[in-house]
Amino acid sequence: MASRWRELHGSGHWDGLLDPLDVDLRRCLITYGEMIMATYEAFIGEHRSPNAGMCRYRRADLFRRVDVSHPGWYAATRYIYATANADVHGKVLLRPLCREGRATECNWMGYVAVATDEGAAALGRRDIVVAWRGTQRALEWVADLKLAPASAAGILGPEGADGTDPSVHRGYLSLYTSEDQCSELNKQSARMQVLTEIARLMDKYKDEETSITVIGHSLGATLATLNAADIAANSYNTSSLSPSGETRAPVTAVVFGSPRTGDRGFRDAFHRLRDLRMLRVRNRPDRIPHYPPVGYADVGVELLIDTRLSPFLRRHGSESQSHDLECHLHGVAGWHGDHRGFELVVDRDVALVNKFDDCLADEYPVPVRWKVHHNKSMVKGPDGRWVLQDHEPDDDDDDDDDD
């Protein structure tokens, strides 16, 4: 993949790579999909925990503790925390039952990572990744967010000042741009946390060939769409130390199961950004990508798959099955089009589709929702009492300037 990275990241708008689906592109998409899955695996979703809404692991240990194929290829450099206005907060953010929790008004929403030396050698460049956490829930969350559109001019730079006033979903924009000066984790908006870190990494690696890849699933896909447009529109893909911003890193968004983010004006502004590409993976039976149904437009190049053709999955799967990220990755591994059958070109373990759901056909001896932390992170102490230990403190919680 190292010699083809520009092609795989959309330099030619993926012409000739989608039907049939290129095997290197399959592997590339699965790698990024696993990096999104890391946000689900590491998120503390237990309401009773005082750490609910936080990340379970330290940045230094993240890729070693989650299920990714290449844990040595990237290092997490910053965690992202997001809050939102009252109309959105209770619908998509988790609040711990314990009011002493640190994430009572915000949630961990992902991370920024950069390719290590090992990863840069394998990938052909120094790749900077922004991974946004989404939701594995099906239709109810996106249907709940029936909010009016809001102007996207603030994130589109000059492209947003052309008189067309492009608009995006107010709820997604709120998650991306809201801050809380009373929060130790969200004094900066998620937007500024990411842009500040991107700028730092672009300066740090100004003498190397770099790329910026923004990834997400479901709700995270909408945030990735906003973030990728923001980076390209406001020239965060250049180093402030390079004369005249002469070196511009390509920005690519890779999203799975994405709802629509903005209107036609936003779509047109997105497509005019010369350094920006987007590949949107859609599973045909998934209804989430059709929301909101009116007034919004699809963005980027679509890769359509249909996991109903897989012989490994339940024939009449649930709505959550069609939206499940692991099922999307299963589809990427084996999809050959409507009339070519289904065969796993990439040897991806079918047991993974039952990690957080009940998707695998009954003849396979794999328990449903088998990804459970040992004893749900309850640890027996020397005094014989059990206590919850589900969070490793991270320097990023307190120090915004850590390298």
From Swiss-Prot:
Compartments it resides in: Cytoplasm
EC number: 3.1.1.-
GO cellular component, one term: cytoplasm
Keyword DNA-binding: no
Gene3D superfamilies membership: alpha/beta hydrolase (3.40.50.1820)
CDD domains per the UniProt record, alphabetical: Lipase_3
Main location as per UniProt: cytoplasm
Chain's role: Acylhydrolase that catalyzes the hydrolysis of phospholipids at the sn-1 position.
Family affiliation: Belongs to the AB hydrolase superfamily. Lipase family.
Entry-linked PANTHER family: PHOSPHOLIPASE A1-II 2, PHOSPHOLIPASE A1-IIGAMMA
Name used for this protein in its record: Phospholipase A1-II 2
Organism annotation: Oryza sativa subsp. indica (Rice)
